[in-house]
Every structure is written in structure tokens, then in C-alpha cells.
Amino acid sequence: MPIGTPSVPYRLPGSQMERWVDIYTRLGVERILFLGSEVNDGIANSLVAQMLYLDSEDSSKPIYLYINSPGGSVTAGLAIYDTIQYVKSEVVTICVGLAASMGAFLLAAGTKGKRVALPHSRIMIHQPLGGTSRRQASDIEIEAREILRMKEMLNRSLSDMSGQSFDKIEKDTDRDYFLSAEEAKDYGLIDRVISHPNEA
């Protein structure tokens, strides 16, 4: 039986009364965001809105983005990526569990020096996926060109974020490329492996 979203007590500043709020709302008050599912438009819109709000409240404080995601939509992920680059706040990215595909891309997109993973995390990079259902050949050709354009753009960005050469990124992302937390650090996708919150 699913447990649903847990609720936790929260006292508004200056108030004597506590009220129960969902845990994600409570974490958001502490500038902690969580990407714990497949990346889609709804998740992206929610994270973008939260980052913009937190940045407008106080851009001198970091935003913490915890990632445990198998990846998902490239366009939705790029909306999150662009927002990470856009906000003035530092964005600390923390991998807990799995950061695969777009999840790994977003992990690497955090503020340099602030990209971390817990010791048993797994990170996976690969090329973008695309489908060709029963469609006209010209439509398939258009989609293939767009996928190849996205692949090059993502690989160039991964090269910039990791310090690896474009050719190495292109070779490594040709198929699923799994890394441990330490391997991801050596590769340049993250900056540190941590085991305590104070290390982030």
C-alpha cells in the first residue's frame, strides 16, 4: 500500500501555532528541492517555479537540488538546466541513489565546486533517445535531424561541465555509460563524494 506524501509539523515564523504541511513544502522553506522521479513537463515547471521563487527571495543563499532520477524528457530537463544557469543563487546538486540520463546532466549542471554525490550513488550518461512510430519517412527524417542536433548540444554542454573532450563525451554517450560516485568525480561530472550534510 503506498504511503503517499508524508506530512510534517511546521510553525510559521512569528506564530505560536503549528500546522501540518507536506514534506516537500517544508523542505522548500529550507531551500531544498527534490527531483525524485522521471523528468517531465510538470516536474520541470514545478522545479523552475520553485527555483525562481527562492532566487527572488534571497539570491545570496544557495538552493539545494537533490536528484534521484532515471532521466526523462530532454526539453523538460533543458528548462531546469537553463533555470539553474539563469538564477543568481548557487545551485548545489546532490545525487542520492541514481542520476541517469537527464538526471546526470542536471547533476553536472550545478554550480562548479558544489556538485556532489553520496558514496553509493550511480550516475549514467548516454545519448538522447527518440522514437519512430509508424510515420511518414519525411517526418522520421525531421525527427532524426532534431535528435542529432540535441545530441550534439547535450554532448557539448557535458564536455563544458566535465572538462572532458567532446570526442570522449561523444564516444562514452554512444551507449549507456555507468559511473560510481568516485568515477563520476574523476570524470568531472561532480566535484566531491560526501557522506555528511555539512560537506555539501
Curated annotation (Swiss-Prot):
Keywords: Cytoplasm, Hydrolase, Protease, Serine protease. Cleaves peptides in various proteins in a process that requires ATP hydrolysis. Has a chymotrypsin-like activity. Plays a major role in the degradation of misfolded proteins. The active site is at S101, H126. Its main location: cytoplasm. It is found in: Cytoplasm. One of its GO terms (biological process) is protein quality control for misfolded or incompletely synthesized proteins. Fourteen ClpP subunits assemble into 2 heptameric rings which stack back to back to give a disk-like structure with a central cavity, resembling the structure of eukaryotic proteasomes. Pfam families: CLP_protease. SUPFAM superfamilies: ClpP/crotonase (SSF52096). InterPro entries: ClpP, ClpP/crotonase-like_dom_sf, ClpP/TepA, ClpP_His_AS, ClpP_Ser_AS. One of its GO terms (cellular component) is cytoplasm. It catalyses: Hydrolysis of proteins to small peptides in the presence of ATP and magnesium. alpha-casein is the usual test substrate. In the absence of ATP, only oligopeptides shorter than five residues are hydrolyzed (such as succinyl-Leu-Tyr-|-NHMec, and Leu-Tyr-Leu-|-Tyr-Trp, in which cleavage of the -Tyr-|-Leu- and -Tyr-|-Trp bonds also occurs). The keyword Lipid metabolism does not apply. PANTHER family: ATP-DEPENDENT CLP PROTEASE PROTEOLYTIC SUBUNIT (PTHR10381:SF70). This is ATP-dependent Clp protease proteolytic subunit 3.
